[in-house]
Amino acid sequence: MTKIIVVTSGKGGVGKTTTSASFSAGLALRGHKTAVIDFDVGLRNLDLIMGCERRVVYDLINVIHGEANLNQALIKDKHCDNLYVLAASQTRDKDALHQLGVGKVFKELENMGFEYIICDSPAGIETGALMAMHFADEALVVTNPEVSSVRDSDRILGMLGSKTRRAIEGAEPVKEHLLITRYNPGRVEDGHMLSLQDIQDILRIKIIGVIPESDIVLQASNQGSPVIHMEGTDVSEAYKDVVARFLGEEKPLRFIEAEKPSFFKRLFGGR
């Protein structure tokens, strides 16, 4: 059975698209046929991070409005055989999205044998975000360890509990997972960032992963490659852990403790 997962947040710039790219790639690397869809109509960034921007001919809106079929619009990922990208439109208005059309796209992807559909949602509560979350079975709620980001995520949790198809039909609720990005244990210790416990006390949903703050994320984006492919880096390992936990594996949280200075660093006055 196909599962639809929305990657969402209340605030922009927290790493939703980075997460959508690496999470979908991680599922595909584990052998699952996966589609990742950009719902940010008018802006479109997912194709850049996936490195397929020059291969976009048709997009989600073209498919919804019958201007192209799904096979024409899906772009096969260059890294993973099981991964396909459906880009957003840069030229249409968000009102071009409608529930019936989105539902038909999901049904067709299910008929094509996709196990997972990852919806890269725009931030906030506009049309694209509502469409991305409406059909969701599960949600990755992405937040930074900052008060404003966490507060906005709380608002999104309220919408997942009231605006989705599952909520409207009185079905089992959307399964919510909390993903914390740009986490810097040193800044947490200094009191400049919220701790994991602070965030959980506010949002009260289970943490599926913690992604450390790193310049590697920008480097991967500039190269047009999901950061999960940056082998040997903390960020790549953290996203692999997220995928493993999502698939039911037990993995302890990593990269959540500040590095202690070595004996020699302390001896010679390093901090």
State where each predicted segment sits.
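Residue-level signature of catalytic and energy-coupling elements of molecular machines
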Residues: 12, 63, 86, 120, ...
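Flexible glycine-/small-residue-rich
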Residues: 9, 38, 87-90, 121, ...
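Alpha-helical segments flanking ligand/cofactor-binding loops in enzyme cores
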Residues: 25, 107, 130-131
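Conserved catalytic-core segment of NTP-binding enzymes
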Residues: 111-112, 116, 122-208
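C-terminal lobe/tail of nucleotide-utilizing enzymes
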Residues: 167-271
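P-loop/Walker-type NTP enzyme "switch/lid" segment
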Residues: 39-111, 221-222
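Amphipathic alpha-helical transducer elements in NTP-driven molecular machines
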Residues: 57, 71, 99, 103, ...
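Walker A/P-loop NTP-binding active-site region of P-loop NTPases
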Residues: 4-69, 116
